[in-house]
Design a protein with these regions (language model features):
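A short glycine-rich, Lys/Arg-flanked "PGG" loop and its adjoining helix->strand segment in the class I
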Residues: 121-136
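A short acidic, Gly/Pro-enriched loop at the edge of an enzyme's catalytic core
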Residues: 93-102
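A short SAM/SAH-binding and catalytic strip from SAM-dependent methyltransferases
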Residues: 101-121
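C-terminal lobe and adjacent flexible extensions of AdoMet/dcAdoMet transferase-like proteins
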Residues: 216-262
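SAM-dependent methyltransferase
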Residues: 141-226
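Conserved class I S-adenosyl-L-methionine
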Residues: 1-38
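Class I SAM-dependent methyltransferase "Motif I" SAM/SAH-binding loop
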Residues: 44-46
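Class I SAM-dependent methyltransferase SAM/SAH-binding core
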Residues: 51-93
Length: 262
């Protein structure tokens, strides 16, 4: 949630379900988990794209998210499943619970944190909170894709102008909208990328809603992720460059990590 107007948040939730339909990450996660029933927590579960399939696979799942519009979509997807629950909560400031077998940080959440906390500190905090929420021997699953940056390299400072349309379409209520990103200012010293997220929505009644939101993200290279995991008491057991099981290469722009709490 980026302090969006309610109309914008509703449009984003609808567009997420229309645009983000891949299942390869879910299938890959299920292959790592195995068939034995597990108690699983998904952090920032959104509309249940991952949470619901985990429940349908027989696992007992819990999820939370700070976006009420996304959470409202889970019920219809879950149907009569009794092994799934979810609530509204803040990943940085709220309690995650304890004694889970697996904590899932998927959907690139480590690169999409919304908080007033220092970004790198918030990234490390999520890993530490995952450790606290896990039972001894439990696992953390991380899917991390830092905005096209190669995870094995530092990134030089740069400034890009221009506009990139991310989503464009009509929501479930017939309102047409567009979400785009404007500019990109990356500081290699801080690892912070700054840009503007622009929303333009035309409602069915002709009303036009526009909102610009200043955003920033922190690029943590793979070496830093490894340090955070080690400091939190994790041992990496499996690591891949993507959810197809390919190895991490020199030019990989993402990483999937499955690490055990020791």
């Amino acid at each position: 949630v980026f302090n969006e107007q309610p109309m914008v948040s509703k449009w984003v939730a609808d567009m997420y379900d229309k645009q983000v339909t891949e299942t390869n990450d879910v299938d890959f996660l299920l292959s790592l988990i195995g068939r034995e029933q597990k108690r699983i927590l998904e952090v920032c579960c959104g509309s249940g794209r991952i949470l619901v399939p985990l429940a349908k696979a027989g696992h007992t799942v819990f999820g939370f998210d700070a976006d009420s519009y996304m959470l409202a979509k889970i019920s219809d997807k879950a149907g009569c499943l009794e092994n799934i629950s979810w609530k509204m909560a803040d990943a940085v400031y709220d309690d995650w619970g304890q004694n889970f077998d697996i904590v899932v940080l998927a959907g690139n959440i480590l690169y999409n944190i919304v908080s007033d906390m220092d970004y790198a500190n918030a990234q490390e905090l999520l890993i530490r909170k995952a450790a606290s929420a896990l039972a001894p021997g439990g696992y953390i699953f991380i899917e991390y894709q830092p905005g096209g940056y190669c995870v094995n390299h530092s990134e030089p400072s740069h400034e890009y102008d221009g506009e990139w349309v991310i989503w464009e379409g009509t929501d479930n209520d017939g309102n047409f909208g567009r979400m785009s990103l404007l500019g990109d200012r990356y500081d290699a010293e801080t690892g912070i990328s700054r840009f503007t997220r622009r929303f333009e929505i035309v409602r069915k009644n002709g009303e036009v809603i526009k909102q610009d939101i200043s955003c920033h993200k922190h690029f943590a290279p793979l070496k830093q992720l490894h340090e955070w995991l080690q400091n939190a008491g994790f041992a990496i057991e499996q690591e891949y460059g993507d959810c197809e099981g390919n190895p991490v290469a020199d030019d990989s722009c993402g990483v999937v990590i499955y690490a055990r709490k020791v």
